[in-house]
From Swiss-Prot:
The keyword Methyltransferase does not apply. It comes from Arabidopsis thaliana (Mouse-ear cress). This is Protein PLANT CADMIUM RESISTANCE 4. One of its GO terms (cellular component) is membrane. Residues 1-10 have a biased composition (Polar residues).
Length: 184
C-alpha cells in the first residue's frame, strides 16, 4: 500500500552522494573520517585507506607490567623482539638487540629504534602521534618501545616467540582422520 497520499509506483529520487572534500594540502576528508592523498590532476583520492589508531596510549606502559620492567632494565631485548616481528624475521631478535645495545652506549638509541616505529606505522596505517617517530623515541624511548610491543600483541603477535614462532602458531593444526576402514 504505502503512505497515505503517495502513489504505489511513484519514482523515488536517488540518494544524495556526498563527495569527499580536498583541502589545500591535497588531503581527502571523506564523510566517514578517512584521510587519504588526493590525485592533483583528478581530485580523487589515491589511497582512501582509513588511518587506524594505536591500541594503547604512549604512557600506558603498565598495561603490560612484565614488558615494562623488561624494557626498563634491558630495552635492547624489547627492541630486538619488535625488530624481528616488524621485519618479518629479516632482523633476528639477537641482531636487532645487539645493534641497539651498541648504539645505546653511544647515546643515540632513538636513531635506530625510531626506524622500527616508522615501519610499524606504515605497515599498520598508524598515525605519527603523539609526535614524529624520532621525537617520540628521543624523549620517551622506553614508553615508545612498550607501546610498540603492546601494539604487536594487540595485533595477534607474541614478540617473545619471534617471527618463526608466530608463523608456526598461525598455521592450522592438521590431525589425521580417525576411524577409516577399507570397504571391500
Amino acid at each position: 500500500m504505502g503512505r497515505p497520499g503517495s502513489q504505489p509506483n511513484e519514482a523515488q529520487p536517488p540518494p544524495v552522494q556526498v563527495q569527499p572534500t580536498v583541502n589545500r594540502d591535497n588531503q581527502v576528508h571523506s564523510q566517514n573520517g578517512a584521510i587519504g592523498q588526493a590525485n592533483i590532476q583528478t581530485g580523487r583520492p589515491v589511497n582512501n585507506q582509513t588511518q587506524n589508531l594505536w591500541s594503547s596510549d604512549l604512557f600506558d606502559c603498565m598495561n603490560d607490567s612484565e614488558n615494562a620492567v623488561i624494557t626498563c632494565l634491558a630495552p635492547c631485548v624489547t627492541l630486538g623482539q619488535i625488530a624481528e616481528i616488524v621485519d618479518e624475521g629479516a632482523t633476528p631478535c639477537a641482531t636487532g638487540g645487539l645493534l641497539y645495545g651498541m648504539i645505546f652506549f653511544i647515546g643515540v638509541p632513538f636513531v635506530y629504534s625510531c626506524m622500527f616505529r616508522a615501519k610499524m606505522r606504515n605497515k599498520y596505517g598508524l598515525p605519527d602521534a603523539p609526535a614524529p617517530d624520532w621525537i617520540t623515541h628521543l624523549f620517551c624511548e622506553h614508553c615508545a618501545l612498550c607501546q610498540e610491543y603492546r601494539e604487536l600483541k594487540h595485533r595477534g603477535f607474541d614478540p617473545n616467540i619471534g617471527w618463526a614462532g608466530n608463523v608456526q602458531a598461525q598455521q592450522p593444526v592438521m590431525s589425521p582422520p580417525t576411524g577409516q576402514r577399507m570397504m571391500g
